[in-house]
Amino acid sequence: MKGSLSEHKAGNRRFTLYLPPSYSTDSGGFPAVYVQDGSSLFQNQIELLESAFQQQRLPELVLIGIEPENRLDEYTPWPAASLSDRFTDFGGMGYHYLSDITNQFIPLIEENWNVTREPQSRGMIGASLGGLISMFAILKYPSMFGKIGSISGSYWYENAAETIHISSLKPGTARVFMSIGSEEGREKQSIQRHMLKKTKQVHQSLKEKGFTEDQLCLSIEKGAVHHHKYFCKQFINALEWLYGKNRSTL
């Protein structure tokens, strides 16, 4: 690793900070990517990430991995019953979480580290429920985020796809990367069996709202299931599509 990883706390919220190799406080601000579920998507991807920097496939990025206090509450937009006796109900505190991140957490990051404050360079990425709430970030705060990565987003969540469909979201200059495995949800008996279908519905809704091929990507990975190793692989793909100079439809 040529950059650095460090643990921090802002208020009650813990986060992992990745600073790229050329980071300094003297140069212009670096694009900042706010990542759900702490460093789980990138802690084992740093070598690949820095290779992309070195090969100029990506500009150097600052990654901020935000630890959730309770992901079943903070990554869901409204309450819903649990799908299993093994888990508690979904708390539906997602809008409160997004407000806290947008109005409290991000300003603290921008005051203390050399990251650009330009919305078009500010990104948010997550996987599973983290991918769902990342998409809702652009619905709630469209002028705040210019890059959204929704990896295997939980669009099976009750009324999530429908809410996105009827929303007043307009594309503006934002770019949105979505991914899903072709086998996700296939063995589920609950509403999670609709993972692939609901993801395609959301993608179609965004196209109907005016998102062009240059602004919207849906990557369907053949044979992939809903698993962390596929999330991590798509994380690098998401960054390269959202921020890379040689973006293409995957």
From Swiss-Prot:
SUPFAM superfamilies: alpha/beta-Hydrolases (SSF53474). InterPro entries: AB_hydrolase_fold, Esterase-like, Mycobacterial_A85_antigen. Induction: Induced by Btr in iron-limited conditions. It comes from the Bacteria. This is Uncharacterized protein YbbA.
